């Protein structure tokens, strides 16, 4: 019997892998899970993974010597089998080698946050996927193929224009929605849930703090601040000391936290995060808004990524939160 293979490296990728299992009614599922050095990230992965029905889990842990030889060993093992579906969460090095070396019927890219938009624009839209970093060439020396001939299809909750080169299957987050229990939900009408940013988004913490203060003053509601798992320590410490903020650190993605604790958030705000999109899909009556980061306070290396995100927010009619000066 053919297997289905999932190569995942983040909590959100595993959530979306589970949605794919449900949508395509898949059995005989193998997970290759790639960990990194961030403890919160890895804890979230394990907490989600234990609730996923899998037939085999292969874990790749961080190593001082790198992951190259571990990748080689795992790819050689995976080559022994045939696959119906191959699901990948990104176009990283292991996936660029797995795709051309495994026998499978179809390849799907599942969402890894806003990064899916970048992958689509930079690689998939124009079939521009065979661009390699030098490190990929090492696999050639060991007899692996690196040229991708497969179509990389999408299982996604993002709304992309129809493309004749790829199949786009809509991920409606059905599994998450089905877990909502409206009769026992706790409605948080008097609080604002603010979702934090990763380390590379905002470079001026004082402006970041000012946005929180203006949000508090403008809305006259307590702010429950949920940090991003990659938030820098100095940002975390700054927010913790604000008297109008309740700091709430999670060991699971915010979508899972709300559902597992029967929380129905009535008001969610952030500067930039995929969770605004997923929460908008799950909680129809919630107010989901974003505060736009100005160019002068963001990391310029990712400014185009931020612009693409805000353009997509506008496309799906996500509301912008405008704050009066105080």
Name each region found by the language model.
Residues 236, 300-326:
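Leloir-type glycosyltransferase catalytic cores
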Residues 37-46, 95-96, 117, 201-203, ...:
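Short, charged/polar "capping" segments at the starts of alpha-helices
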Residues 191-231:
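Conserved catalytic-core segment of nucleotide-activated headgroup transferases in glycan assembly
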Residues 231-277, 281:
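Donor nucleotide-activated moiety binding/catalytic core segment of transferases
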Residues 111, 117-119, 123-195:
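A nucleotide-sugar donor-handling region in carbohydrate enzymes
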């Amino acid at each position: 019997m053919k297997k289905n293979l999932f190569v995942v490296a983040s909590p959100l990728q595993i959530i979306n892998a589970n949605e794919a299992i449900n949508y395509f009614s898949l059995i005989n599922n193998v997970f290759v899970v790639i960990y990194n050095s961030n403890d919160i990230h890895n804890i979230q992965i394990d907490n989600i993974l234990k609730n996923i029905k899998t037939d085999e889990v292969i874990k790749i842990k961080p190593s001082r010597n790198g992951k190259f030889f571990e990748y080689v060993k795992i790819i050689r093992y995976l080559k022994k089998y045939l696959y119906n579906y191959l699901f990948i969460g990104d176009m990283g090095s292991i996936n660029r080698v797995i795709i051309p070396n495994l026998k499978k019927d179809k390849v799907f890219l599942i969402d890894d946050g806003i990064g899916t938009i970048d992958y689509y624009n930079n690689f998939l839209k124009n079939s521009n996927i065979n661009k390699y970093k030098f490190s990929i060439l090492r696999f050639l020396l060991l007899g692996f193929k690196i040229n991708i001939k497969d179509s990389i299809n999408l299982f996604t909750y993002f709304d992309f224009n129809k493309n004749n080169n790829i199949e786009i299957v809509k991920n409606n987050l059905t599994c998450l929605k089905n877990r909502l229990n409206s009769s026992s939900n706790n409605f948080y009408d008097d609080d604002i849930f603010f979702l934090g940013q990763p380390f590379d988004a905002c470079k001026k913490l004082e402006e970041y703090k000012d946005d929180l203060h203006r949000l508090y003053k403008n809305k006259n509601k307590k702010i429950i601040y949920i940090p991003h798992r990659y938030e820098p320590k100095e940002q975390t410490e700054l927010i913790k000391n604000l008297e109008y903020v309740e700091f709430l650190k999670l060991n699971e993605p915010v979508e899972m936290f709300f559902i597992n604790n029967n929380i129905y958030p009535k008001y969610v705000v952030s500067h930039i995060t995929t969770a605004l999109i997923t929460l908008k899909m799950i909680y129809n009556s919630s107010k989901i808004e974003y505060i736009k980061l100005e160019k002068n306070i963001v990391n310029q290396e990712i400014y185009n990524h931020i612009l693409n995100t805000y353009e997509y927010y506008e496309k799906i009619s996500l509301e912008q939160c405008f704050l009066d000066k105080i």
